[in-house]
């Protein structure tokens, strides 16, 4: 490719609204062009990188037995009604009508679509297992699209679905796909982790995320420093903590506690640790057709994990869609006073009460007395009947690993893949069944597997690039080598550049010849910005010495290469990175 023919509209400055370096570099280097909020055009350089990512993905998925298909981007809303997700998914699901007044959705995920395919064409256990996948455009109407391709509304996704006759078969495919994903991300040259995760709106019994470690990541993962335990902070667990020594032993009594509304101030008032204070957190619960209130109790030195809290509610049948902060008006309406909420008589004020599992059989506790400026001491939870306990706290870095007692540490990360065990939920709601070996009708066990193809462009750059521009990995750079001529008006330099260009092409090197009549500094700036893996410099000294200067984009390290060794050395350098 000649640079003069390459459509790469570079910018002098990155967009003003770009925050992450990946967004800045992709826009400034002419990879992407924004056409609307969270919607981007992929220009030739980006398309080359996308193609490489997709080719690696196709290769590994098919090696692991998956078959490539292409499903409709537009899906009947009636399918989403059958699965129950039309209302549950929320406003991120874009619903529209055609000219005949039929309702459709632009797919953010395709569980309904693929399940309908299976229901129509897989009739016998003899056809199982089946794993089908696609790479296609998706749309999620994000309320706040940001960070370029990291949180876009329109994006490219590899999503796959598997169908099985039993849970054992699903377990095998879950691990098989996990292996495929590990190979894909390793081929892409990424430093990543596999972590336990929440299943979210997709549902299912078990899920794992594949996250790329980067300080600019949206997510926080909790990693053990001693073993391989790793989990998204939304579901991370910890070992039971040892109880502090100064236990505030007391008979049940009510004490005046003026202006002590925080767990810390209550602990200081009673000269004890926040560990022994019951912290009450009231949330407004949003259901499909109503709103209720829930109260969650944790120890005073813990914080509520909202995802865990929502899941705990749904386990007890709340059918909650989301949680929101309860306003002062919400509390006033039910007669609760912030800072003084406790378990005594609370059932008449809220619809749901859940205690963190660390409080099970807890005694010697201090809690709000449900009366302004009063707290109760000597609270013993064993005296209450039918309390609901669940893991609802957010793990802290001071906590210990649930597997080995090792220290837990936070890491910022960016999710690039997610695999789920869906079970029979979608199959039952969409009546997708088959006949087993005994001729009995059974519902499919399903798996779901996704990789954010377009998001991977940002993930690679967030982990690998520098302040100058794009740094790609071995298998993702748009070009292997750019040939930069110091003085394009020098016919001898120009002639040598074309000769070298042809020599590299013959060796299978994806080379870009910068044939522009531009300043040498400007050409090198574009090399740093675009991120070809190597820059081969041709100047007056090259003609005299028969030696080339070669620069690695990854670290800007320079190396001198003799003309007679050119192809051999270039291939070695490309293979080594």
Curated annotation (Swiss-Prot):
Family annotation (Gene3D superfamilies): Anticodon-binding domain, Bira Bifunctional Protein, Domain 2
* Assembly and oligomerization: Homodimer.
- State the EC number(s): 6.1.1.15
Tell me which domain of life the UniProt entry assigns to the organism this sequence originates from.
Answer: Bacteria
Its main localization is cytoplasm
Q: What gene codes for this chain?
A: proS
- Catalysed reaction per UniProt? tRNA(Pro) + L-proline + ATP = L-prolyl-tRNA(Pro) + AMP + diphosphate
Query: Which keywords appear in this protein's UniProt record, sorted alphabetically?
Result: Aminoacyl-tRNA synthetase, ATP-binding, Cytoplasm, Ligase, Nucleotide-binding, Protein biosynthesis
Compartments, as annotated in UniProt: Cytoplasm
| Domain statement | Consists of three domains: the N-terminal catalytic domain, the editing domain and the C-terminal anticodon-binding domain.
Q: Which PANTHER family match?
A: MITOCHONDRIAL RIBOSOME PROTEIN L39/PROLYL-TRNA LIGASE FAMILY MEMBER, PROLINE--TRNA LIGASE
Q: Per its UniProt record, what InterPro entries does this chain match?
A: aa-tRNA-synt_IIb (IPR002314), aa-tRNA-synth_II (IPR006195), aa-tRNA-synth_II/BPL/LPL (IPR045864), Anticodon-bd (IPR004154), Anticodon-bd_dom_sf (IPR036621), Pro-tRNA-ligase_IIa (IPR002316), Pro-tRNA-synth_IIa_bac-type (IPR004500), Pro-tRNA-Synthase_IIa_type1 (IPR023717)
> GO terms for CC?
cytosol
**NCBIfam families hit by this protein:** PRK09194.1 (NF006625), proS_fam_II (TIGR00409)
Which one GO biological process term can you cite for this protein? Answer: prolyl-tRNA aminoacylation
Indicate the family of this protein. Belongs to the class-II aminoacyl-tRNA synthetase family. ProS type 1 subfamily.
Protein name, please? Proline--tRNA ligase
- Return one GO MF term: aminoacyl-tRNA deacylase activity
- Purpose of the protein: Catalyzes the attachment of proline to tRNA(Pro) in a two-step reaction: proline is first activated by ATP to form Pro-AMP and then transferred to the acceptor end of tRNA(Pro). As ProRS can inadvertently accommodate and process non-cognate amino acids such as alanine and cysteine, to avoid such errors it has two additional distinct editing activities against alanine. One activity is designated as 'pretransfer' editing and involves the tRNA(Pro)-independent hydrolysis of activated Ala-AMP.
Q: Which organism is it from?
A: Helicobacter pylori (strain ATCC 700392 / 26695)
């Amino acid at each position: 490719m000649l640079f003069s023919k390459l459509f790469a509209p570079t910018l002098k400055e990155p967009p003003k609204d770009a925050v992450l370096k990946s967004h800045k570099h992709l826009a400034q280097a002419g990879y992407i062009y924004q056409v609307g909020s969270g919607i981007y055009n992929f220009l030739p350089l980006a398309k080359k990188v996308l193609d490489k990512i997709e080719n690696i993905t196709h290769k590994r998925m098919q090696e692991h037995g998956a078959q490539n298909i292409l499903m409709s981007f537009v899906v009947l809303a009636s399918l989403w009604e059958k699965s129950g997700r039309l209302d549950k998914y929320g406003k991120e699901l874009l619903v529209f009508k055609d000219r005949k007044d039929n309702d459709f959705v632009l797919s953010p995920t395709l569980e309904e679509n693929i399940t309908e395919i299976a229901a129509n064409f897989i009739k016998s256990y003899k056809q199982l297992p089946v794993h089908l996948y696609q790479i296609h455009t998706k749309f999620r109407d994000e309320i706040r699209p940001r960070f370029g391709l990291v949180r876009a509304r329109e994006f490219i996704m590899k999503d796959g679905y598997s169908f099985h006759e039993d849970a054992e078969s699903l377990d095998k495919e879950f691990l098989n796909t996990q292996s495929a994903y590990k190979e894909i991300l390793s081929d892409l040259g990424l430093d990543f982790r596999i972590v336990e995760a929440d299943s979210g709106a997709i549902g299912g019994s078990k899920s794992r995320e594949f996250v790329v470690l980067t300080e600019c990541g949206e997510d926080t993962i909790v990693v053990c420093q001693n073993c391989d335990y790793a989990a998204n902070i939304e579901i991370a667990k910890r070992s039971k903590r040892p109880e502090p020594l100064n236990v505030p032993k007391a008979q049940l009594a009510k004490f005046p506690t003026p202006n002590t509304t925080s767990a810390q101030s209550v602990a200081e008032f009673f000269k004890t640790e926040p560990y022994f204070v019951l912290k009450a957190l009231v949330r407004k619960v949003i259901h499909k057709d109503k709103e209720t209130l829930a109260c969650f109790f944790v120890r005073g030195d813990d914080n509520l994990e909202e995802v865990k809290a929502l899941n705990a509610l749904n386990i007890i049948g709340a059918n909650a869609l989301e949680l929101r902060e309860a306003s002062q008006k919400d509390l006033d309406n039910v007669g609760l006073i912030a800072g003084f909420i406790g378990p005594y008589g609370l059932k008449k004020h809220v619809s749901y009460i859940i205690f963190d599992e660390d409080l099970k059989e807890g005694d010697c506790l201090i809690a709000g007395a449900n009366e302004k400026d009063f707290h109760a001491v000597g609270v013993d939870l064993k005296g209450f009947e039918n309390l609901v306990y669940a893991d609802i706290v957010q793990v802290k870095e001071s906590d210990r690993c649930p597997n080995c007692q090792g220290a837990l540490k936070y890491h910022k990360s960016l999710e690039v893949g997610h695999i789920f065990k869906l079970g029979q939920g979608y199959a039952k709601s969409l009546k997708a069944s088959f006949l087993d070996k005994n001729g009995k009708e059974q519902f499919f066990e399903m798996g779901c597997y996704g990789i954010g193809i377009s998001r991977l462009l940002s993930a690679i750059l967030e982990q690998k690039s520098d302040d100058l521009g794009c740094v790609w990995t071995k298998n993702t750079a748009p070009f292997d080598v750019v040939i930069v001529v110091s003085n394009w008006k020098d016919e001898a330099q120009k002639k040598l550049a074309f000769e070298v260009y042809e020599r590299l092409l013959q060796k299978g090197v994806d080379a870009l010849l910068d044939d522009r009549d531009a300043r040498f500094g400007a050409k090198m700036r574009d090399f740093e910005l675009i991120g070809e893996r190597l820059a081969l410099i041709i100047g007056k000294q090259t003609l005299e010495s028969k030696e080339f200067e070669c620069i690695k984009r990854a670290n800007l390290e320079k190396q001198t290469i003799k003309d007679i060794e050119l192809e051999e050395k270039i291939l070695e350098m490309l293979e080594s990175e």
